[in-house]
């Protein structure tokens, strides 16, 4: 391998991948599981605000529920990613899904108790924090373990498409979430929570019985090796993830207020405008991950640069125009841009480390990506100055990330595949490792 790339690319090795038929089945199972978690997020975002008013919770308390869980996620995602290197992917996925199911059901039960005065009012908010934090503490392992599972079973050349497919599952879930909420709320405002909790349990059972895992965990992860977030191969990608996730939260957290304050949409109609904007963002992100990434066959670095430029244009739409249709196009550009950039740099991070470090690097990137949600209060403070300030901040941040990518050798060389990697496809008789 050329010396100039030796610091940035994992050492050449033999890559074992499952057969194409088994990969399709396995990735389909993971897709449904992550779709379930994505749907849960949007159900929570859509139902919690009106419920919080009935529970007499302030806006600060409501946003704190998300912020505390996200802060815990930042720490624990790295931990569970490393554990998946030692325990295997399936145990960590199962723990995450079961914790998500328990957290979602318990969170709904606390709100139900509050609505019916079964618990003292003073206990509701702390219990909401605790039950939601269960997801942040234990549920954060599902995504990095799933991404590492994909890395275990794809060649370096296929990695970008595999990572994008798994990432699109969560995005499709965010589109399905409002539909699930509309379908089940006639049975009660909290019915969607219990439905998604049951769906998560069914997904966990499917993973337990049907998901193959052939690589023995101990062979995958030497006990003496522990990837750190400040490892020079990983740190640039982690910093990039923090910046990208922070920029991506700006439209998510402010577009509803922007419609009311800049377009003068009445509050009773703002939810409809917001739903149209969210749908445009989600569908564009899905198009990026399921069509552009899968069929354009661009390198991870090119995909990241294209995503940064497209997301920058979305910020310009908010800064320069005050027309709803133009802003919807801007939100679609936001979804398209971040939908391209995320799998691009995530794949670069995966290819920068060795096979036995895939869980650890997925955890580091997953934790760093959650940092953007912790920045919510900062974005809100900027919005108080002017509705345009957060979008100017996001534009500057995206431009800075573009420059950073060219200045950092690790990011600049991301996605370069060593020519001497040997690909070995497992056959159907290969023993399945115990989960």
Q: Model-predicted segments: where are they?
A:
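Juxtamembrane intracellular "pre-TM" segments in multi-pass secondary transporters
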Residues: 7-24, 212-239, 423-435
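Hydrophobic core of transmembrane alpha-helices in multi-pass small-molecule transporters
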Residues: 35, 116-141, 326-340
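Short amphipathic helix-loop junctions that connect adjacent transmembrane helices
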Residues: 46-61, 253-273
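Transmembrane alpha-helices of Major Facilitator/SLC transporters
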Residues: 71-75, 273-296
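Helix-to-loop junctions at the C-terminal end of transmembrane segments
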Residues: 76-89, 287-300, 383
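C-terminal ends and interior cores of transmembrane alpha-helices
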Residues: 98-121, 310-322
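Cytoplasmic helix-loop-helix junction between adjacent transmembrane helices
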Residues: 129-170
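C-terminal transmembrane helical hairpin of 12-TM major facilitator-type secondary transporters
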Residues: 300-345
